Amino acid sequence: MQNVNTYDCIKKLVTQLISVLIVINTIAWPSIPKAYPIFAQQSYENPREATGRIVCSNCHLAKKLVDIEVPQSVLPNTVFEAVVKIPYDMQIKQVLANGKKGALNVGAVLILPEGFELAPPDRIPPDTKEKIGNLYFQAYRPNKNNILVIGPVPGKKYSEIVFPILSPDPALNKETHFLKYPIYVGGNRGRGQIYPDGSKSNNTVYNASATGRVSKISRKEKGGYEITVENTLDGRSVVDTVPPGPELIISEGESIKVDQPLTNNPNVGGFGQGDAEVVPQDPLRVQGLLLFLASVTIAQIFLVLKKKQFEKVQLAEMNF
């Protein structure tokens, strides 16, 4: 009986410990650099604003390049590759949430036309599966299968991300047509500078909140600094807090102005967006084009043969 009580006690203690860890992880999760795709999904119904800007740029302030490659035309109900390229210098390291340096992650959002969606696993060709690797794609919303997000994933391994896309069949989906459609993409490398609530991350520059003289700089126990700025006019002091990560570019005794940078800008990443176009091709149109080309080729062959025959007749008449 005592053993049973002891077992129940231990089981209860372990359950409580797991619950506490889950709560702590939930609270701390936003500061972790792996959270950025979720920020957009939680805060915005659509990742692309009416102005054409993708909402990831609200948190990732630096502009960087991103590129996308898709076929110019695709047949209905076929799988094709959309390759998103997020280039950056693989040697650089970023500031992590704890202030230490680490490798960059990358992420991307792909906005497809209505009707296009992620290809089912059983439809993806083996060579495409090999390019995808262990990547996991998800829909931006349960009702938006045409908007796909990925990341964060290690940038050194996935600076090129291959999306397997299934094209629609206009014969079955009456909302799609054999027209030219735009595809939009956004891609980022590294952590953002601002969280959705407007607060700064430790991956950005910190500015002075007041004009005055730096009277004291204190290093905090867990990293970062507290900078005391004394107003030389009224003697009031303001304390600016800098989290671990950014490096100070001011010193004690220095006179500073409001909004003057106190730190360097540690950000080495950035966000970029691009677009491409794809045209679903009508198979009958393709067959008609091939038939037309074949008929033109045959006509040219007959024309050449007829010309040679005519030349032979002319030559025979001249000899006669």
From Swiss-Prot:
Membrane-spanning intervals of the chain: 286-306
Binding positions (heme): Y36, C56, C59, H60
Names of required cofactors:
heme
**GO CC aspect terms:** chloroplast thylakoid membrane
Q: Where is coiled-coil annotated?
A: none
Q: For this UniProt entry, what is the primary localization, expressed as one broad class? A: plastid
Q: Which residues form the signal peptide?
A: 1-35
User: Does DNA repair appear among the keywords?
Assistant: no
Per UniProt, subcellular location reads as: Plastid, Chloroplast thylakoid membrane
User: Which BP terms in the Gene Ontology apply to this protein?
Assistant: photosynthesis
The protein's UniProt keywords, in alphabetical order, are:
Chloroplast, Electron transport, Heme, Iron, Membrane, Metal-binding, Photosynthesis, Plastid, Signal, Thylakoid, Transmembrane, Transmembrane helix, Transport
Judging by the UniProt lineage, the source's domain of life is: Eukaryota
What topology in the membrane does the UniProt record assign?
Answer: Single-pass membrane protein
Pfam families documented for this protein? Apocytochr_F_C, Apocytochr_F_N
What InterPro entries does the record tag this protein with? Answer: Cyt-f_TM, Cyt_f, Cyt_f_lg_dom, Cyt_f_lg_dom_sf, Rudment_hybrid_motif
Q: How is the cofactor bound?
A: Binds 1 heme group covalently.
One function term, GO molecular function aspect: electron transfer activity
Family annotation (HAMAP family) = Cytb6_f_cytF
PANTHER family linked = CYTOCHROME F, PTHR33288
Function statement: Component of the cytochrome b6-f complex, which mediates electron transfer between photosystem II (PSII) and photosystem I (PSI), cyclic electron flow around PSI, and state transitions.
On assembly, the entry states: The 4 large subunits of the cytochrome b6-f complex are cytochrome b6, subunit IV (17 kDa polypeptide, petD), cytochrome f and the Rieske protein, while the 4 small subunits are PetG, PetL, PetM and PetN. The complex functions as a dimer.
Family assignment? Belongs to the cytochrome f family.
Annotated protein name in UniProt? Cytochrome f
Native source organism of the sequence: Huperzia lucidula
Which gene codes for it? Answer: petA
